[in-house]
Every structure is written in C-alpha cells, then in structure tokens.
Amino acid sequence: GGRVVFGIGAGWVAAESAVLGVPFAERGAMTDEHLEAMQELWTNPAPSFSGKYTQFSGLKFEPKPVQKPHPPIWVGGHSKAALRRTVQFGAAWHPINRSPEELRAGQAELARLSQARGRAVPPAITLRNDVRIVGPGQAVPASTHGGRVIAGEPARLIEQISELAECGVEHLVLEFLSEDGRELDEQMAAFAERV
C-alpha cells in the first residue's frame, strides 16, 4: 500500500471545459478549491467544506488514504499559476515536455515561491515526456502536447534523460510516440533493453 500519487492539472483546452459546462476562466480557482476539499476529505474524520464550487458536511469519507496526511499531489502545468499551486498544495511539480532551460527556470521559481510562503523544502520536480527511439536520419515525430520530445538513438536518449536528472527531475513518466500497438511494444522493449 501507499503507492498512490494524486495528479491534478487545471486543464488547458477550452473546448474540454465547454463540454463539461465548466467556465474555462474559472478552472484555476476551481482546481484550488477542489484541492482544499480533497485535503479535508482525506484528513478529517468528519469532513465539511463550504466553498464557491463545492459544499459538503455530515458525510463519512472512508477509507482514508494509507499515506499520511494524504497521497502526494503532483500538480501539472507550466504556468505561473501552476507553479504557485504546486507550492501551495503539491509534493511535486509535474509539467509536460519541458526543456532543461524551462525546468531550471521553473525550479528557481519554485524555490522563490517556497521561500515567500515559508515552505522549508521546495516541491520535487517530476516530468511527463514524450519519447521516441529513432535511427540515423529518421524524423522525430511531433508531440501532440507540444514542447520537447526526448528522441534519438538509445545513447542520445540516455544523454537527454541524464540532463533532465541534472535539472532536478526526480521522476520521469514516459509516453512512447508510436503509430500502433505493435510499434509501441517495439519502442518499449528497445527502451527497456538499451536505455
């Protein structure tokens, strides 16, 4: 037990918010409030909460998480609001496809925000990144999320991942870019064997 990570992001696609009937401009405030509500549910034996978007009382929320006080929260995004949210609520900042330069800048901002908030230890840095093993002369596919793709021959991937570790990335969540299931299996097997 105790291996759950709670990942959350405010979202960045306005059309998704529209389908759900959620005002896109309020997504950050809603995310903050929902994080407060989740912490109340996780930690209080008789939880109650009264906010703009969420209200509850007189309920039982069981079982409580194995991790205390609650599962680690990884906050997605790379905006200033996401960094602020990470310092306020998160155990880790979890952006997608960021370059080493962007990660270093984010790390510096997390340290600044943590100090301003009186947080002794800044959040960890985790990263979700697209990855693709390619041979000489092969094109690197574009990411559906934009940003940097970890790509190249296995030795080049090792260099890129090492550079991310030097930037403070503690966990790397990979999404293999592939055309189909067969190619996905090949990419993952090659990565496991050679990277």
Predicted features along the sequence, with ranges:
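Active-site-adjacent structural elements that line small-molecule/cofactor binding pockets in enzymes
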Residues: G1-V195
